[in-house]
Each structure stands twice: as structure tokens, then as C-alpha cells.
From Swiss-Prot:
This is GTPase Era. Residues 51-55 are annotated as: G2. Residues 133-136 are annotated as: G4. It comes from the Bacteria.
Amino acid sequence: MDIETFLAGERAAGGYRCGFVAIVGRPNVGKSTLMNHLIGQKISITSKKAQTTRNRVTGIYTDDTAQFVFVDTPGFQTDHRNALNDRLNQNVTEALGGVDVVVFVVEAMRFTDADRVVLKQLPKHTPVILVVNKIDKDKAKDRYALEAFVAQVRAEFEFAAAEAVSAKHGLRIANLLELLKPYLPESVPMYPEDMVTDKSARFLAMEIVREKLFRYLGEELPYAMNVEVEQFEEEDGLNRIYIAVLVDKESQKAILIGKGGERLKKISTEARLDMEKLFDTKVFLKVWVKVKSGWADDIRFLRELGL
């Protein structure tokens, strides 16, 4: 579709809907996995570790009747206070401004004080849909127990509606889309129908490397790291990408590189393969490690990183 046709609104509003949907919840309830399934493509990083999403990621799903613009947010942080986590929480609050509907994600059979903290941040005049995720878990397979859990959570807040899903297995994702659709305003689409994210290739490359860091490092180390794309060159049939991983200490650098450079090599290789699949082209990827002490508490530096 050329830009003139798109801007002219080739598809008249006439019943068509388009709007913004914020996906929020405490860390590690499956928000990023949910968004990836909602749009039908992986653009937001996932990990079993909490707080893998640091930047708001916009995913777009378009069908014949509606266009959904999803905003995936960092999990709201209640522990480990520092400038970085304060900024992540501010990102959550900012993401809620101007959306048409909010999806509040909780883990099936597990509602905690951290969930309640997030609930208190939700807007009072925007519809909020409760989404109970991970219904594939053994404890959630008891229908009556699951219904009782949903009723328990609904008693905590005035939700507009509720749905139970398994983001991991793609269960009831279509039901959730249909549930959300009436909350979007009538409008022509904001983005071309073949567009799945408004994020740049540089940003997506950075996110892929961050995902591999979370996958192959210990529980704490990835949280002390940041990823920067220092150079991104698109040539005919080849993307050349140069990425620096920022750590706080020399000891962290040694752990990341691994014995004989094996760990960094594994991270780089898997990231390159994912990039080639996403960008549909060959990728030359160079990843190295830099040490900057105290970066996570340096507010000016965090702003430079766009956090």
C-alpha cells in the first residue's frame, strides 16, 4: 500500500475500529508472550526471569474489522529501588495515558500483593480487562477452582470484563481479541495493514540480544546490564550490526564472556540467527562488552539510553 492511499483512508471507518491497548501487570506474568501471540509475531522479548521488558514495545494486529495497537510495558517494580527501576515504573504510568483499554494480566491461581500494587496504578476512567494467564498450569485445570480464582480477583477492582488464556500455548487468544474489540473507538487504521510494530530494526536487534542475555546468564547478572546498538548498516542482502553490552563491573564482564569466549559466542550466534529470521536477510553481528560503573543509578545516562 503506498502512503498516499493509506493516508487517504482507503478503508472508511464505517464500523471499523482502531485504538490503543496497554498490557500491564507485575513482572513475569507473561505480558510479552501474550502480546507476541496477539499480533502473531515475536517482537517483545520473553524470559522466565522477571523484568525482561525495559522499553514500551508497540505491537500492531490488523484484521478486516479492527486494528489493535498494543503497548507492552515493563513489570511494575516494587523491589530493588534504583534510578533504573524508578524509570521503568514511570514508563508503566506513561503507557497508561491515552489508551482506550487496559489489559491487566495476572498468573492463574496466584494473586499477590505485587498485583495489588499494580492495580492501584490503573486509571479509574479507562476500561480494564482482567486477563488470567497460564491456565495450562495443573492447578488451573480445575474449572471450578479457576472460576473461584477469577471471582476472587474481580472482587479487588471494577473490571469491565475478564478472560482466561494461555499465552504460552496460544489458547483463547482469538476470544480475547473479540472481547477487546468493542472497547476500541470507530476509526480508520493508524498503520498500514502489514505493519506489526512501530519499533525500528535497531531496537528489535537490541531486544533480541537482551533476550539471549537473560536466557544464558544467572538470576541477577542480566539486570546489571544494558544493550546498546552502536552501528546498524543495511547493505544489499546483508545487515551489519554492532552491539555493545554494558556492565557494572569487570567481574561481570568476565562472566558474560565466559571461558575462552564461549558464552558470548553462543549468545551472539543465537541472536544472529533470530535476527536473520526476523529481518529476512543475512546478518553480520558483532557483540562486545563494556564496563561502566554505576550506570543503573546514573539518571542522566539512563535518559541518554532512552530509558
